[in-house]
Amino acid sequence: MYIEGKWIMVNRLFMIIGTGSGQREDFTREARDAIARAGLVLSTERLSANLAGAAKVRTCPFGKLAENALSSTAARVAILVSGDTGFFSAAKSLRQKLTEHGEVQTICGLTSMQLLCAKLGTPFDDVVWLSLHGRKGSLLGAVSYNRRVFALTGGEQNAQQLCRTLVEAGLGHLRVSRGENLGASNEQILTGTAAELAEKPCGDLAVLLVENEQPGECCLPVRDSDMERGSVPMTKQEARWAAVNLLDLRRVPSEAFYASV
């Protein structure tokens, strides 16, 4: 098959499968069928726990999934990833590594946002989402200008620490729902203020839904009346607007910009 200027062998099929929370009941029928048809199933240790007894399951660190898939002799290889293959997923990097070596199929799964919102009985069509799990970004920036923000958390930006950040910014009153180990037997969902959840320890597999009933308007200009010292503005509004435009900033929901002009 000729794809993007390259000839590739298509006698091998790599199936990247989203497994939702990782619990068997969260697997779609398509995912279960694909696993049953595969000659080899590759998974991290955490996801393989729910596939106990399956002889064709091989566990390895995440960084070795693609390498193990390519070195195997199986014609059909299933690779399990958590969540959905299109939502801040490892599927993207896996596809890039496997495309030149065979056909790559992605099978979607449930996102943690869907799981949490379903448990809370709330829609997610108006939610701004971002991932802070091993990534840089600002929950504060997103929460300041949006009514509802969903965030994947982890590492240095864990759920408890993010709630502390909101408290430090004067947003400790905001309503926050925290989902931990969603779908597992030790699942825990808590709802309270950011200040309340900032005092409650949390593991690494957690997500947040933050609600701000009075978000700011990011596009409102700062006028002279907002910058007066005595009766004289510190700078002219036209100068401030021109200076900010020259910075050529792009609005990113997870980022906050600060300027002194």
Label each residue range with its predicted role.
Residues M9-N11, D33-A34, S72, L98-T99, ...:
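Solvent-exposed alpha-helices and their adjacent loops that cap or buttress functional pockets
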Residues G5, V10-G18, C60, R76-V77, ...:
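A contiguous loop/helix-start segment that scaffolds small-molecule binding in enzyme catalytic cores
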Residues S48-N50, T111-L115, K136-G137, N158, ...:
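Short gly/pro/ser/thr-enriched loop/turn and capping motifs at secondary-structure boundaries
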Residues T19-D26, S131-G134, Q237:
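Short gly/ser/thr-rich secondary-structure transition/capping motifs
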Residues Y2-L115, Y258:
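Class I S-adenosyl-L-methionine
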Residues Q237-V252:
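Conserved alpha-helix/loop element of class I SAM-dependent methyltransferases that forms part
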Residues V252-V261:
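Conserved class I S-adenosyl-L-methionine
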Residues S112-R147, G154:
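Short, glycine-/small-residue-rich phosphate/pyrophosphate-handling segment
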